[in-house]
Amino acid sequence: MLVIKNLIFWLLFSLHTLFFFVVLLLSAVLPARLRHSVGTVWAKGVVGLLKSVIGLKYQIEGLENIPDTPSIVCCKHQSGYETLALQAIFPSQVFVLKKELFYIPVFGQGLILMSPIAIDRKKPAKATKQILEQGKKRKDKGFWITIFPEGTRIKPGEKGKYKLGAARMARALQMNMVPVAVNSGLFWPKNSFLKYPGTVTFSIQSPIAWDFGSVEEMMQQCEQKIETAQAKIEQAVHQQ
């Protein structure tokens, strides 16, 4: 039954994505924020499909920790689920992502129209410059910025190296950092066709001020907040 539900999901996902890709292309001449709203509706629609077809939904801890002003969301990255659900949880945001994603047929063209901050991970020095330059432009337009500080998807129970890019951007743009833990990998395994029913937890931690300590101390604080919450929400699922 799970396989059948996943097949149905992927069929509906494809139709849903094709429709919104056409809409997004037609909206290419519109201002960035209007184009972005189209992508947000698409993302929320996919989250709805996952809930209704697969039985995969989410809950939020720490909703009161979301600031009133645009900030930098530093989120654990375990699956594609958070790239969708975060758009329903936080205000209009752009993602920091690797530029190679632009080369994916259809999906890549849609990404470009969503005004992300694209970086070249093979050239760290250049990537930092790109984050700061493009980040300022997005901030000036009122966007929040979402970044995955470990730079890639991490399996549940594991931890990657936290890079300084988010803290450097926060310091340069004077934007606070909002650490977020998420256990989506327990229900949407890396490189898996199957998604599993359950409740993903997003644990939003108290913000880190952009002028807190040094850049290294900011990132250490972010890592500590995420990993502490991460252990709790993953353990909670295992104990069910």
Specify the residue positions occupied by each region the protein language model found.
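Generic preference for hydrophobic
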Residues: 60, 73, 95-96, 202-204
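Catalytic core of membrane glycerolipid acyltransferases/transacylases, capturing the structured
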Residues: 17, 21-40, 51-53, 68-124
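Short gly/ser/thr-rich secondary-structure transition/capping motifs
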Residues: 52-61, 128-129, 183-186
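Membrane-interfacial terminal anchoring regions of lipid-handling membrane enzymes
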Residues: 1-28, 64, 137, 217-240
